[in-house]
Amino acid sequence: MKSFFLVVTILALTLPFLGAEVQNQEQPTCFEKVERLLNEKTVKYFPIQFVQSRYPSYGINYYQHRLAVPINNQFIPYPNYAKPVAIRLHAQIPQCQALPNIDPPTVERRPRPRPSFIAIPPKKTQDKTVNPAINTVATVEPPVIPTAEPAVNTVVIAEASSEFITTSTPETTTVQITSTEI
């Protein structure tokens, strides 16, 4: 019974697409001739995606199967809706002059850098070898390392003279380390 209702629903959805002929709204390229220059046909599409979403017994197809036939074949059902495509025969060619494209481009094109711009120029070879007159033995300054030594302070409280509180605070001193390495 479910399959019968499914077939009836599919037929009810596809009959308007199969019976009705959609007229192409494309304007002719020549303004002198009002009649159509080319024999144009429109391609009809089959709404399978709607039926699959309505009836979960078909299951959801997660993969789009691409058919190995031309897209303009009107006898093969397609899973999605698409705009009708006009098919033109190659025998009839319009004898009209093409209008120039007046609209400016919307995207600004950037120039590509040439390989000569990217290439690094070769180094010039010098005839003489110049020895620098700089002292190569550098003096090493000893690093300064701070060390912390704890100092003990005693504080006497006037109220409790028998108790002493000791606190330790670190004091920082700097010690210079000298090395004889060169």
Swiss-Prot record:
InterPro entries: Casein_kappa (IPR000117)
Gene Ontology annotations of biological process type: lactation; protein stabilization
Pfam families for the chain: Casein_kappa
List of glycosylated residues: 154, 161, 178
Endpoints of the signal sequence: 1-20
Keyword terms, alphabetized: Glycoprotein, Milk protein, Phosphoprotein, Secreted, Signal
Similarity field: Belongs to the kappa-casein family.
Protein name as annotated: Kappa-casein
Gene source species: Camelus dromedarius (Dromedary)
Organism lineage: Eukaryota, Metazoa, Chordata, Craniata, Vertebrata
